[in-house]
Amino acid sequence: MFTRIGAAAYKKDLHNTIELCEALGNPQNYFQTIHVAGTNGKGSTSHMLAAILQEAGYKTGLYTSPHIKAFGERIRINGQMIDETFVIDFVARTKELTSKVEPSFFELTVAMAFEYFATEAVDIAVIETGLGGRLDSTNIISPILSIITNIGYDHMNILGNTLPEIAGQKAGIIKKDTPAVIGEILPITKNIFVQEANEKDAILHFAQSRYQVEYLEPTGNLLFCHVKDLQTNTTEKLRLDLNGIYQAKNVCTVLCAVEQLRALGYKIPEAVQQNALEHVKELTGMRGRWDIVQSHPAIIHDVAHNVDGIKQVLYQLKTSYPNAQLHFVLGFVKDKDVEHVLDLFPKNAFFYFTNAHIPRALPHEELRNIAAQKGLTGEGFDDVNEAIEAAKKLAGEHDAIMICGSFFIIGEIQ
């Protein structure tokens, strides 16, 4: 399975997913969907949209990956994780089918999610891609709206080494005669989306051309955000419980997506939208995005794991804790661009190198050696929680401890 093993488990075609779903009666055709792709921000965007839709009264499915603690995090309806009995029954019922098709773990979970949403008769489901878009297992749906949050460097061994190549894979979720929202715009990739949309008679909506963040202030566990609608020249004052400042980009994408949903007939009052954005964690169970779990010293969990994601959390650390001694509990998986990620970290910080207990994890000894070549020094730990305890013992009351680098590192925190 890709989650634990990595690129070796990735399959570059939709054959297995199509065969699985056809055998199940194509459950993905029995509910409306929104498809979300992007290098960073697709999980946050998916959760925000799901929160808004369910708060507006729609029975809302949500499929995301990977999970942090429990498998059920991947498949939710109105924030509630999939019933364990359904999972057990699904695996038992499809045993003969899976023996024949031999799907990957991800392919099987996609089919399971689609059948669960169909069985439970959701009104709509927000479906996050696993990797890329064009050949991702989720890309057998016919969404009413496609969303691409941004394009950055990640999974280059699979998606391509250039931003246009990566964009070309993400653009594959744009569908014929279907609106598509593009979050961040890069001059080098914009034409990729325009060309794909033209070929499919899809209408593109660029969030950055419609919305602009005028004011941004993280305060405790909330992010205060003023967003200007450039079309109506009005400003909406929002409070987000997803309080990483990088969420400002995502919220513009979400607002643009909600406008398209309203145009499609979905009734989403402004007050409902505002309340949902303030309670995303409560409504959808989202975790791992700038979670401040302690104040003195500050302890923050974030699943940031690539160059763009790490840049964002380091910027917020610098602005939120300008005088603090920084401590980093770090662990990565083998297929990440660790060398370039480590170039971003301050050399005067304390480091605690560790690894999750999965085959795909980069051993902490190897991570420590790479870091030493970058001028970053610290100790190595076999266990994530041992690394955290070491950081807590050394950190002063006014220091800040950042735990990041992988979903799996966050998942092993006790």
Predicted regions and their residues:
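A conserved segment at the C-terminal end of the G1
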Residues: V36, S44-G61
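Acidic, Mg2+-coordinating active-site environments of NTP-dependent enzymes
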Residues: P103, A125-E128, I147-K237, V251, ...
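Beta-strand->loop->alpha-helix junctions that form or flank phosphate-binding loops
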Residues: G183-E184, N198-P218, L240-G244, Q274-V280, ...
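Nucleotide phosphate-binding/pyrophosphate-handling subdomain across enzymes
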Residues: T119, I124-T129, S137-I147, I151-H155, ...
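C-terminal helical cap/extension that packs against the catalytic core
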Residues: L186-E196, D201-H205, A298-H301, V307, ...
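ATP-dependent carboxylate-amine ligase catalytic core
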Residues: A8-L14, E19-N29, E55-I141, N157-L159, ...
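Charged, amphipathic alpha-helical linker segments immediately N-terminal to NTP-binding catalytic cores
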Residues: M1-A8
